[in-house]
Amino acid sequence: MQRSPLEKASVISKLFFSWTIPILKKGYRQRLELSDIYQISSADSADNLSEKLEREWDRELASKKNPKLINALQRCFFWRFTFYGILLYLGEVTKAIQPLLLGRIIASYDPDNKMERSIAIYLGIGLCLLFIMRTLLLHPAIFGLHHIGMQMRIALFSLIYKKTLKLSSRVLDKISIGQLVSLLSNNLNKFDEGLALAHFVWIAPLQVMLLMGLLWELLQASAFCGLAFLIVLALLQAGLGRMMMKYRDQRAGKINERLVITSEMIENIQSVKAYCWEEAMEKMIENLRQTELRLTRKAAYVRYVNSSAFFFSGFFVVFLSVLPYALIKGIILRKIFTTISFCIVLRMAVTRQFPWAVQTWYDSLGAINKIQEFLQKQEHKTLEYNLTTTEVVMENVTAFWEEGVGELFENAKQNNNSGNISSGDNRLFFSNFAILSTPVLRGINFKVERGQLLAVAGSTGAGKTSLLMMIMGELEPSEGKIKHSGRISFCSQFSWIMPGTIKENIIFGVSYDEYRYRSVIKACQLEEDISKFAEKDNIVLGEGGITLSGGQRARISLARAVYKDADLYLLDSPFGYLDVLTEKEIFERCVCKLMANKTRILVTSKMEHLKKADKILILHEGSSYFYGTFSELLNLRPDFSSKLMGYDSFDQFSAERRNSILTETLRRFSFEGDAAGPWNEPKKQSFKQTGEFGEKRKSSVLNPINAIKRFSIVQKTPLQMNGIEEDSEESSERRLSLVPDSEQGETILPRSNLINTGPTFQGRRRQSVLNLMTHSSVNQGQIVHRSTAASTRKMSLAPQENFTEMDIYSRRLSQDNGLEISEEINEEDLKECLFDDLESIPAVTTWNTYLRYITVHKNLIFVLIWCLVIFLAEVAASLVAFWLIEKTRPQDKGNSTRSTNNTSPVIITSTSAFYMFYIYVGVADSLLALGFLRGLPLVHTLITVSKILHQKMLHSVLHAPMSTLNTLKAGAILNRFSKDIAILDDLLPLTIFDFIQLVLIVIGAVVVVSILKPYIFLAAVPVIIAFVILRAYFLQTSQQLKQLESEGRSPIFTHLVTSLKGLWTLRAFGRQPYFETLFHKALNLHTATWFLYLSTLRWFQMRIEMIFVVFFVAVTFISILTTGEGEGTVGIILTLAMNIMSTLQWAVNSSIDVDSLMRSVSRVFKFIDMPAEESKYTKSVKPYKDGQLSKVMILENQHVKKDDIWPSGGQITVKDLTAKYIDGGNAILENISFSISPGQRVGLLGRTGSGKSTLLSALLRLLNTEGEIQVDGVSWESVTVQQWRRAFGVIPQKVFIFSGTFRKNLDPYGQWNDQEIWKVADEVGLRSVIEQFPGNLDFVLVDGGFVLSHGHKQLMCLARSVLSKAKILLLDEPSAHLDPITYQIIRRALKQAFADCTVILCEHRIEAMLECQRFLVIEENKVRQYDSMQKLLSEKSLFQQAISPSDRLKLFPQRSSSKHRSRAQITALKEEAEEEVQDTRL
């Protein structure tokens, strides 16, 4: 970054913002880079500001029982805030004085006051000086207030982040990541620009008092008629605002539903394509879009009427103020024009500035209270341990994650007994809820000597991770004592990678030791991986290590823990993502050898690890099931083995018995969504997280329309969808609605829905920060949105008369009432959705984009012509007013000759009053009617254009090849459907209309003034040209600065999420200060771009004002010096001149807004223009013998349910297959060739990242491929993509459950009747799972099916494959994270339903591979071996290395003799089961 010219700028340069000219020049000539941005001053640095506020907040905490954050802010910023408020007030006072001078100028042309004609020139000079004074007062004041708001935001950002790192885990379990992002983005954005409006809470009343005093002098009591009308108008607009909110509320639920489905589609686009669900998803989303658009139109119409009412009210304000006075006493022209000018200022103060100011204070104080509450939450306390011992001792330790759970349980029990539960299985309710009534750990006793290895095992939710958290001090014991040496190193169950190099991630701030580092790298099997990178271990990893495989991330996390020299190492399931061979090598070389002299506590689920551990602790439901050695385990706990053995007899049970066992076993996991498998904390479940049963669950999702729009979400909950009534409460955070035409809803993006364990529980579920840290969150069906990109400038809803820049700014800000971010957000994708990648879209929207947009709908051009025709009609109506003046001039002369010395010349007399009244009202009504006719068709048509563009973009994304989609972030795609479509729906129609109307008003006014004084036209032309040139000059730089600001905003939030995910690791390593420094750097980077944007914007606005002042000086003196008799002409010219330039100033700003919004259209067009998948693959369809291909075409078009001729056997032949993820990328698979016979089962073997899953994707034509694949002799080039994929059944690695009913999830095309679906559900053991929910097949699943365990979801995928009647089945890690019983269910179903099918299986479990006849071994992207298991075991191979000799002797009987099959499976289960303890008692 460069040094800022502001440091050496003169006072004049600072006053006129001339120091920004260098960056404006550079931005106009070339594309700006981050290096071009100026450095911030020390006063704006996050370090200084946070230190200053933190000092005052600590002082507030120490001195008072009830500390107030606003007091700390006041001590930091009050005097500067007050100073700029006074400047702002003085600038506003000049607006009230201007009409006085205007009246005096008009009065100087009074025929009876010829003596005053000589002072007109001086009055003109005074009027011009007032404009200059206003410019010099307002702009520094606005900029200063923006600057203070920015500093407040930075200081609070830092304070919140520091507090986040200190929060206790119990508090973090109650806070969602969305709440934290809301504090940082939504609440704090209110300070950034809203601070400039805060002073109007006292300025506006003073302004009204001053204006009413001046109007009283002119019109006496009649002036209050106009004020009363303005108050009524404000109330009317508030009513219209509430009506609009009603439509917004209704519409928000539909937007939510659409975006939930859309996000699920995008996140699982590979599964959608694999299942051939493109048409079903498109139809589903478009149906929701239709309903949404009906409500969008209604809201847009009300909003249009609202803003139009404000604009056209100008006629009636003046009319009602003047009429009573005129009827009683008559009125002169001077008073009319002066009244018009006063009423314009008065109307702005009453209907805009004061409501906005109250709203700003209401929002700001609410935000401060939220932040204050957050800053007072309980902090993490490091427990005081006995530092003299080198052992770990726990004595009768009991702990709860949630305090007061017993009371919560009793309340739930009372609710249940009182009959609040409408229907359903009560046993289900209590079997789930009983988990919460017990402590997470209870009566734990163990002792580990120095250098020993303690293996901790147990079923899911047994409390294994909680045990480690207890040792780390994250969980405080309720009873008992803990002792250990205190120096801890920790490896999380889910790998955490910070942005930086591999080396930085491993060293993690510890002093570098070359020998130790190399030893750790070798022991953690990272040498080979690092050697593949060109930069070796200096390769920079993205946030979360997204460029690495899961296994690589896990090994880096383990290496970080091992590298630190500690007394105690806590390893929480570090081998979860490793293949069998790698896991075996790391356990032996790293855990057993390298760390042999260290005390280690290892959470594991492997029998081999238990054998080699010095001590074993088995937990079951929070209690110690066993503590001792492995030999003692076999002797003292024989039931531990018998339970495993019992699983082998599972197939012998009846179907009802199997379903009962399955339901009872999985029921324990169903509460935590995907918490089955290795996720360890289902005790910290939704009941506890909600805090209380009746709490209304908040919205999830970061608003995609960053700082543009707010929507209120009111959506049917799943209970309501399923026919169960729910008590709805008004949200406690409803906003005070004072600004009638602002969008005061909540957010537009989806809400996760109710927990649905049946009809028995009406509590709410949300993802807490603790769940983010433990990854026990639902990672499907959630949305971010997304985007905290740079604010698009705010839009006007209606043209304004005689607006100052402050009025314009205020109006713009009203459309940005703050980004109301809801309580939740999808943590998994937050990093992707905070900003869009820097896209190849020009800084200024091209004319081609405008042309394409106009031609999207054939009627749009005609509507634009219609607007022009209406405009001409309005001009004609305006001529009536001038005719009126002309008609009254003779009467004026007559009246003046008949008048006495005490009577002024009048326009309206008692004899002509009613005649003039009817003409005036007629003109006003005509303009009102014409205005409505002009705008509504345009708004209606532009919303239709948005509908068409959404349809085209949705179709394009669904049918785009994966190679194209792989180059895009999910968040970037989702932003197109959320942020950009919302802009097209809401902002763009009214903003385009606004711009067109403003331009036409300016043209019309210039024409009228030029007709009255042709010389003024000569002055207007160069001024308009200057405006256009200035706009083009500024726009190039401003758009680039906003783009850089957007990029600078992203690291702030990604750093927050990164820190939260690794918070336990940060604390264990003591790296909080380092991460605070990184956060401050991110803040400073964003501050530099935002401050420069504010400065250049102020430069632009000030230059507009300066041009306006020059023009007004010219108009004033031309009109004064060239006008003879006729006060009316001078009044019209000066009044219109003031109106022209303020309107033209706003028109220029509006054009910038339109250009900014049209960038959303450019991005939508970019997605519409993506290549289609079919065109990429389709070649001429070759005829096939016996008409087989034509029957395939029937399958494609009609989704026939009967068995089709192709494929009939399932034979697969692959020749020279090469696959790439993206065009031009590296080959993931090279020259793969093999063949599979019909009905054969083939297992894929290979290390993590070798390309097994990639091969399955290539078979489905999801990648860029070369070579040939044939199924039953039919080449993939001779059939369509859809036909090809329907030949395969798929169980993907990432399970896809979209928001919808069970029926829709199993059969989205509606091909099968209920009888057939229930039959398949019986086959796969899914019936009892579905029957426990109300509505059965019609029960609505939400949030990626969070009420289902991972096992349930795998069964859903299995049922889909059975329904597909496919002859080829592809399975990608189907047993991942499954408990033994569900695993046995899936094995049995696969044997029965797919007995005659060809199966390709990618699996890490050795037992699962035993069903395969042949194995395909993939190494280094190529096929190394393709043989039977016996052949592979007899040769040196990867498969042989993974199996020990003793295991081989046990496995062979399974293949050679059916009599010994049972015993072999028992042995395999003993060795490989991931859950050692399962309670299957019914």
Curated annotation (Swiss-Prot):
Q: Where is this region: Disordered?
A: 1454-1482
EC primary class: isomerase
Report the PTM annotation. Answer: N-glycosylated.
- TM region(s), chain numbering: 78-98, 123-146, 196-216, 223-243, 299-319, 340-358, 860-880, 920-940, 992-1012, 1015-1035, 1097-1117, 1132-1152
Protein name stated in the entry: Cystic fibrosis transmembrane conductance regulator
Which gene carries the instructions for this protein?
A: CFTR
Where do we find the motif PDZ-binding here?
1480-1482
Where does this protein have compositionally biased stretches of type Acidic residues?
Answer: 1472-1482
The principal localisation class reads membrane
Membrane topology value: Multi-pass membrane protein
Topological domain (Extracellular) residues are: 99-122, 217-222, 320-339, 881-919, 1013-1014, 1118-1131
Spans annotated as Disordered R region: 654-832
Q: Which residues form a coiled coil?
A: none
Provide the family line: Belongs to the ABC transporter superfamily. ABCC family. CFTR transporter (TC 3.A.1.202) subfamily.
Look up the EC number in the record and give it: 5.6.1.6
Q: Which GO terms describe its molecular function?
A: ABC-type transporter activity; ATP binding; ATP hydrolysis activity; bicarbonate transmembrane transporter activity; chloride channel activity; chloride channel inhibitor activity; chloride transmembrane transporter activity; intracellularly ATP-gated chloride channel activity
Q: Name one GO cellular component term.
A: membrane
Instruction: Name the source organism.
Output: Rhinolophus ferrumequinum (Greater horseshoe bat)
Catalyses which reaction?
Answer: ATP + H2O + closed Cl(-) channel = ADP + phosphate + open Cl(-) channel; chloride(in) = chloride(out); hydrogencarbonate(in) = hydrogencarbonate(out); ATP + H2O = ADP + phosphate + H(+)
Keyword vocabulary terms for this entry: ATP-binding, Cell membrane, Chloride, Chloride channel, Endoplasmic reticulum, Endosome, Glycoprotein, Ion channel, Ion transport, Isomerase, Isopeptide bond, Lipoprotein, Membrane, Nucleotide-binding, Nucleus, Palmitate, Phosphoprotein, Repeat, Transmembrane, Transmembrane helix, Transport, Ubl conjugation
How does the entry describe the domains? Binds and hydrolyzes ATP via the two cytoplasmic ABC transporter nucleotide-binding domains. The two ATP-binding domains interact with each other, forming a head-to-tail dimer. Normal ATPase activity requires interaction between the two domains. The first ABC transporter nucleotide-binding domain has no ATPase activity by itself. The PDZ-binding motif mediates interactions with GOPC and with the SLC4A7, NHERF1/EBP50 complex.
